Amino acid sequence: MYGYQFHNMQIIARDNHWTPFSTMENHYNLLYREDEKELIPIFQQKNVSLMPYSPLAGGHLARNTWESNTSRGKTDRVVHSKYDHFEKQDMEIVKCVDELAHKYHCKMSQIAFAWQWAKGVSSPITIH
């Protein structure tokens, strides 16, 4: 979604006396940060909470290798279509997350979540 689209939806809600959006579920993590350009500034301006899905980028921010040995990791076409195209450059970020996890004696996932909370994310959506 583009920023102007979200803004227009807020105007439509206001003009029709509907409840405006207070939370937005968006795709946002250390490997995918497109929303920082338009949407997140509008969310901040309008006091809208962020609830990103895929905070661990399909598991890529939870392990120091790109490939997963799980059945899902081998067959999940959605994760592959979202992330595999930029594997080479994204692995640089994954390596940094791994280094920080070692430095602070914690899990890579904790670093990824801490980054989101530092960016103002109210509640990342995770599925176990």
Residue ranges and their predicted role:
Residues 72-81:
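Short Lys/Arg-rich basic patches
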Residues 55, 85-128:
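Conserved short secondary-structure transition element at the edge of the structured enzyme core
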Residues 35-72, 107:
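Aromatic-lined glycan-binding groove of carbohydrate-active enzymes
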Residues 17, 47, 101-105:
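Glycine-centered helix-boundary capping/hinge motifs
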Residues 19-25, 47-51, 122-124:
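Structural preference for beta-strand elements that scaffold enzyme active sites
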Residues 1-38:
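Glycine/proline-rich, positively charged
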Residues 2, 28-32, 54-61, 115:
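Glycine-rich beta-alpha junction loops
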Residues 6-9, 43, 123:
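Hydrophobic packing residues within well-ordered alpha-helices of enzyme cores
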